[in-house]
């Protein structure tokens, strides 16, 4: 997509050449990266991505990683970054660059349940999500497999519930089941029980162009069954950016958001007045961008990046020499 194709009064979605990248990097202090589909696919790093991030670190750029994936703790994500060659702090500071929805959901519940003695949450999610909640003092129940008990609805509804559950938290849960859905709805019949979703991604990119169903599918199921709307923590919700901003002291004018999804990464950047770069190694395509550019819907026009690259490795020439 050439610059002339961007249309409108403001030229956007420009290919980020090495020359433009040098100018852009001179204007920014902080780069925020999505992870899945940007830095890696599954357990395989995007070619050239580790070298690019190491070069950015060498130039003194501050890096942050904002991921909607709730299946790992901050520390586990930091370990993956180092294992795949992206570098990063070690020791007590390991994980401080990472802002995942597991960690930020824990911060959200700590705020919302402040003053509640011994707060407890029913978690449809991973042990990592439960661990982040436990780290801020929120007891977690429900993690792991849970099959249907009994022969029918009367038996399912007779299964005892944990007392004093004040929140239902829905993250990525490979053990999601009808039993869990039934329990979640029963907890949410209490009006003071919060419904929190880590993110609304409808699918998760893997290697070789494959995808699996994302957390958003599970959140929607609970919302529909409970007839409640979840508080969403992850991108494009501003809450996750506020978590980063509070810990990093970010100046939006000198910050770039780099991602592969228009409806999460780029929309978050647009909402928070950040510069945005779309990388084509993940979910969204230039055809998706063009559709948003040509739309009469102002909301869709927010999902148009300032720049795009085939891969974040395209930034490397601007960092060499």
Swiss-Prot record:
SUPFAM superfamilies to which the protein is assigned, alphabetical:
HAD-like (SSF56784)
- Residue pairs linked by disulfide bridges in the UniProt entry: none
Q: Name one GO molecular function term.
A: magnesium ion binding
What Gene3D superfamilies does the entry give? Answer: HAD superfamily/HAD-like
Q: Catalytic positions?
A: 34, 36
EC no. given is 3.1.3.21, 3.1.3.48
**The keyword Metal-binding belongs to this UniProt entry's keyword annotation:** yes
In the UniProt record, does the keyword Oxidoreductase occur?
Answer: no
- Locate the residues binding Mg(2+): 34, 36, 260
PANTHER family, alphabetized: 4-NITROPHENYLPHOSPHATASE-RELATED, GLYCEROL-3-PHOSPHATE PHOSPHATASE
Which tissues show it? Expression was confirmed in liver, adipose tissue, testis and pancreatic islet.
**Requisite cofactors:** Mg(2+)
Role noted for this protein: Glycerol-3-phosphate phosphatase hydrolyzing glycerol-3-phosphate into glycerol. Thereby, regulates the cellular levels of glycerol-3-phosphate a metabolic intermediate of glucose, lipid and energy metabolism. Was also shown to have a 2-phosphoglycolate phosphatase activity and a tyrosine-protein phosphatase activity. However, their physiological relevance is unclear. In vitro, also has a phosphatase activity toward ADP, ATP, GDP and GTP.
Marked site (Important for substrate specificity) residue numbers: 204
Residues that span the membrane, as ranges: none
Question: Could you provide one GO biological process annotation from this protein's UniProt record?
Answer: glycerol biosynthetic process
Enzyme class name: hydrolase
Pfam families hit by this protein: Hydrolase_6, Hydrolase_like
Q: How and how many cofactors are bound, per the record note?
A: Binds 1 Mg(2+) ion per subunit.
NCBIfam families from the UniProt entry: HAD-SF-IIA, PGP_euk
Swiss-Prot/TrEMBL keywords: Carbohydrate metabolism, Hydrolase, Magnesium, Metal-binding, Protein phosphatase
Show the GO cellular component annotation of the record: cytoplasm; cytosol
Q: How does it assemble?
A: Homodimer.
Identify this protein by name.
Glycerol-3-phosphate phosphatase
Q: Which family does it belong to?
A: Belongs to the HAD-like hydrolase superfamily. CbbY/CbbZ/Gph/YieH family.
Q: Which reaction does it catalyse?
A: O-phospho-L-tyrosyl-[protein] + H2O = L-tyrosyl-[protein] + phosphate; sn-glycerol 1-phosphate + H2O = glycerol + phosphate; sn-glycerol 3-phosphate + H2O = glycerol + phosphate
């Amino acid at each position: 997509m050439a610059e002339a194709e961007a249309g409108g009064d403001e030229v956007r979605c420009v290919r980020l050449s090495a020359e433009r990248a040098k100018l852009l990097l001179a204007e920014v202090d902080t780069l925020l990266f999505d992870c899945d589909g940007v830095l890696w696919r599954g357990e395989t790093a995007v070619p050239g991505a580790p070298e690019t991030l190491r070069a950015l670190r060498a130039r003194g750029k501050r890096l942050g990683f904002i991921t909607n994936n709730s299946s790992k703790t901050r520390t586990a994500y930091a370990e993956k970054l180092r294992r795949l060659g992206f570098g990063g702090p070690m020791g007590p500071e390991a994980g401080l660059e990472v802002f995942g929805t597991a960690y930020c959901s824990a911060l959200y519940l700590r705020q919302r349940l402040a003053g509640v003695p011994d707060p407890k949450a029913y978690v449809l999610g991973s042990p990592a999500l439960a661990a982040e909640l436990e780290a801020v003092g929120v007891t977690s129940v429900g993690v792991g497999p849970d099959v249907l008990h009994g022969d029918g609805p009367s038996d399912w509804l007779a299964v005892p519930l944990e007392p004093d559950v004040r929140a239902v938290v829905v993250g990525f849960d490979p053990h999601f089941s009808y039993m869990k859905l039934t329990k979640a709805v029963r907890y949410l019949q209490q009006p003071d029980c919060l419904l929190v979703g880590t993110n609304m991604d409808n699918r998760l990119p893997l290697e070789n162009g494959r995808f699996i169903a994302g957390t958003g599918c599970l959140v929607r199921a609970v919302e529909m069954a409970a007839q409640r709307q979840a508080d969403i923590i992850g991108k494009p919700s501003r809450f996750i950016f506020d978590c980063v901003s509070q810990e990093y002291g970010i100046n939006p004018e000198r910050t770039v958001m780099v991602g592969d999804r228009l409806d999460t990464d780029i929309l978050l950047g647009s909402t928070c007045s950040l510069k945005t770069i779309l990388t084509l190694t993940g979910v969204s395509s230039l055809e998706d961008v063009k559709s948003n550019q040509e739309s009469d819907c102002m909301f869709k026009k927010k999902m148009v990046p300032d720049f795009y690259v085939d891969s974040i490795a395209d930034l490397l020439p601007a960092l060499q020499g």
